[in-house]
């Protein structure tokens, strides 16, 4: 067993670390991480810092596939184990490996009925760990809504984030009735909630078998924003704006839009209903669609068509805005119909 040398010392966001009160080790299961990539290292460090018993981590054989943990500091004080040692010492085994490797790695572990098999993928279904369930183990998905490209930063910014959790109980356990109903009554979900809160995360319980939809939705709120920024920059390039000025102007605009959405959600939370949970976001929309400014919308569409650009994308985004504005009651029926009619002129034929 090896231990990386210098412990990681949080500097980028020490206030978040101070907000977490370490929980006595006996209150949590013993956990081990199979895989020492960015997610595994970040979570192992966060759990260890919070007082959760992290018994060790497993990394691939360094002769065939070196794992770059030297100098990272996130795994300092956490023993490196063999796969056999991890299975013997841990109650929860976290498979923090690439999605395509989850099933293969799960098949190589000597599972027992006291184990909980965990993966951190957003889209991969829990059935990828079927071999663990066949051995009597419970399955759990634990997907922090967090960016792990910079692990040291990720450790410090975990507090305040949400985590998507899905559970498939062991064969001997009662069947899961529904994500929210079981959230307060199932011991396994209570344990998962306690672990999440130990590192400052708030759970979102996912309906079984719907991870792909959950992950696609998260993608809209994350990387899809980057695609929209790129599309905006492409239009600006045609408008003659210097490339070095584009992101300097667009990124603050995007940040202010997110801030407006947060404010609208907080101010109009009482308007949200089960049938229209995102209605408050309609109050954050600005621009010609929000004003029902038909002339401007038509000029936008004409310009895009003239330059052979993506009119369908503009229409699709505008139609989503119309739906939100309608749910929020921000436009009259007459205004909504006028915007829809303007968009329909450019519908594919």
What are these regions (language model features)?
Residues 2-85:
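NAD(P)+-binding Rossmann beta1-loop-alpha1 motif at the extreme N-terminus of oxidoreductases
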Residues 28-30, 114, 160:
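Phosphate-coordination loops involved in phosphoryl transfer and adenosine-cofactor binding
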Residues 41, 45, 49, 107, ...:
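Short, well-ordered alpha-helices that flank and scaffold nucleotide-derived cofactor binding pockets
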Residues 43, 66-75, 153-268, 272-277:
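Internal alpha-helical scaffold of NAD(P)-dependent oxidoreductase catalytic cores
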Residues 72-154, 179:
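Rossmann-like NAD(P)(H) cofactor-binding subdomain of soluble oxidoreductases
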Residues 146, 331-349:
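Short, basic/aromatic-enriched C-terminal tail that caps enzymatic domains
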Residues 262-268, 274-334:
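Interdomain hinge/lid region at the active-site interface
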